Amino acid sequence: MLILCVLPSTMSRSAWVAAAISCAWVAYMHRDKRKWSILWRRYKKRYVLWGAGIFLILSLAAAGMFFLKPDSALGRRFMWKMTCRAIAAHPWGCPTGFACAYGEAQSLYFASGNYASWEERVAGSPEYAFNEYLEVALTYGVAMCILVLFVIFGCLWIGVKLRRYGICGALISLLVFSFSSYPLHLPAFIVTAICLLLACGIGDVIGKYLVLCVCLVLWFGGYAEKWTQERDACRDWVNARILYRSGAYEAANRAYEKLYPSLRKKGAFLFEYGHSLHKSGRYDESFEYLDQARLYSNDPMILNIMGKNCQALHEYKCAEAFFLISVSRLPGRIYPYYLLAKLYSEPDYRDKDKFGDMKWNVLNRKPKVYSTAIEEMRREVEEIAENWDTGSSIICSDDVESEE
């Protein structure tokens, strides 16, 4: 009852659905078949009417959950669509991980121009697919996903045969929740899933003690030390981030350099390191770390800073390519259009027609979140346009980088 009191306050529709389905399944499995058979024959019409009423209520509840947070629901639908496209491109798995494959699929989709306006509005740069099954299929391959599902349903079958309905219900709840969230990216849920699989019956088949011994060997064989090192590195990262955000980039660079061996697979860390190097004027080094960050994050800001590095090195074609990829990654963002407008106003790369197109996008596109940064970008683009015919352009020491 305590859990039922807390559940509504979470505003998690996935959790509500998972709890409802698992509870209904457990209640159904504990039914008295003989009594239900007698009642069905006696009150068949009444049960049919009740069933129709329950179906109507559930339909209204589903519609209500959608309209509770419509953009969130549409956003997940779009993420699943992009993940499926990425799976089609990488049916045997993507060795570079989810973020890289997802970002590539989304860029190609928006670059085609064949998409709905709501898709542009809800698109983002997610770290997870919000569907564990699709993410496993993309990261490790469709065959591995099928194998994992086979093992899970095998455990459920054993659990049902052993009449462990409560444990099976808990596992079903986790499976339903995994359909529209990312529980298996959190250690607590991973441990819970392993314990539930063992309790369902697979532990009786292969031996609980054997499984526990294997887990302990893996833990003490490296994972414990690795997680401890990463935890300590993340603590030091917080201190380095203070330097980064306060503008002490040289000091931040030294701190990031020490942390790099432990955090070299974290996209957010690599972006901060690369951006800090960019701010320090070390454009080649910045490009190197941002190129690594692309493998672990699909944030278009990585592409924007890579393009700015190229522009600072007077490699304008390369800069244009990165800015255009950023536009196709999230066409609703104004910042890459602003960067392209500034690029096309460079004395060695001036293009009035392309500048005009980018100016229109900067001035007329509606941002997701309005801010003073939007005003600054629009004002600067208008100033560049006013000074275009005189042959001069507005040169700023730094671009606006906080937007939307």
Give each language-model segment a name.
Residues A252, S286, A319, K354-F355:
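Single-residue signature of alpha-solenoid repeat helices
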Residues R245, K279, A312-L313, E346-P347:
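Register position in tetratricopeptide repeats
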